[in-house]
Amino acid sequence: MDVVRISAVKKSGLFLCGAMLISSSAVKANIDIGVVLDGSYQNESRHWGSRDKGFSLGHSELVLSSNIDHHFKGQLVTVLASHGGETELELEEAWIETLSLPLGFKLKAGRLLSHIGYLNNKHMHEDAFIERPAVYRAFLGGHYFDDGVQMSWLAPSDFYLQTSIEAFSGKPLDAGYSDPVSVGVYTANVQIGADLGVEHSWRWGVSALYNANGRQFVHSESSDHNAHDHHHDHAGHSHGPAITGRHLYGTDFTWKWAPEGNYRQTNLRASSEFWYLDNRFDPQMANVPGAEQAAQGWYAEVAYQFQPSWTMSTRYGEVRTVEGDVHAHGDHLHGEFSRGDLKEWDVALDWHASHFGRIRGQVTYEENVDGDETLFSLQYVMSFGAHHAHAF
């Protein structure tokens, strides 16, 4: 995705002018404007993570949305984040969506979050933890958004049934091809769910993603970069998936409980996802010692709001994969693959005096081939202005 880096001197003036222009125009155009401020501190960088060691700007958002007319609505989301001492401005969403198609169909076009999985189409500030699960960071770069189109259908019934198909450029998931397929990614997703009385509800989904530009291949030793340099701008930080392949399959399940249906007082959410990535390498790369065509990962998490202002969350996840630096030198190859597995356990405690402000403390234990690590993190997530309801 296109990223604009702006200096500390310029950014304050740029956003002050932008905010003044937006607020003036919004009064006339009846545009909903929302801001999410996200900042954090952590004692070490996370494996495949996106946040710097120490203090950093997390995933702060400026959201503009409005109905265009009775046929269309639109939304634009820009994100500010800091990586390696630089501040990045990124356009995360810029889409239009139909409002009047018959029979429960909707068409969305532009830059949008893919509808695969449970977490991917949610904004990062909705999460119960500072970073997405390791399997999301490894296979989707945290969350996958792209330029393309999405067609969805919601069944007109009490039983929840929604399906969607998507076509995207695939650039964020490109393994480094010099002439990639222009429409490189196709996805499909099916979700079902229901309420069980007033206290319980559940949702189950299956997803599939085809990535025409996802198979990794051997680069020459004289190349300026390897297959994934464009995903890693600095060591330890990911701006895209660490692992790509041609086929990605996933399934997710979520269950929610609230005594007497009162989510404001006490509630519990349990969710889990499993992802399987296949066809990772082209034939030449597949013959490298240690190569494995499949990688897989999963996580399970529980978030329990035991008081109106307090939530305790815990999550465990794993990724099983091989990693290596392989390149061609003349008529032979250099390098090999070795285990790159990661196990991760998180515990977080949130204080939230309202729906719009949250302070989080988190402890993470990572176990991988490079050694074990314990991370301590603090985060604030504050929002003001228009704030739309969160999805299930």
How should each PLM-predicted stretch be described?
Residues 1-9:
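N-terminal secretory signal peptides that target proteins for export/translocation
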Residues 12-23:
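Bacterial N-terminal signal peptides
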Residues 29-173, 180-198, 301-322:
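Outer membrane beta-barrel
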Residues 41-47, 82-86, 115-119, 157, ...:
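Gram-negative outer-membrane beta-barrel proteins
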Residues 58, 90-92, 169, 184-186, ...:
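Transmembrane beta-barrel architecture of outer-membrane proteins
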Residues 199-335:
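Detector for outer-membrane/organellar transmembrane beta-barrel domains
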Residues 251-253, 351, 372-392:
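Outer-membrane beta-barrel "beta-signal"
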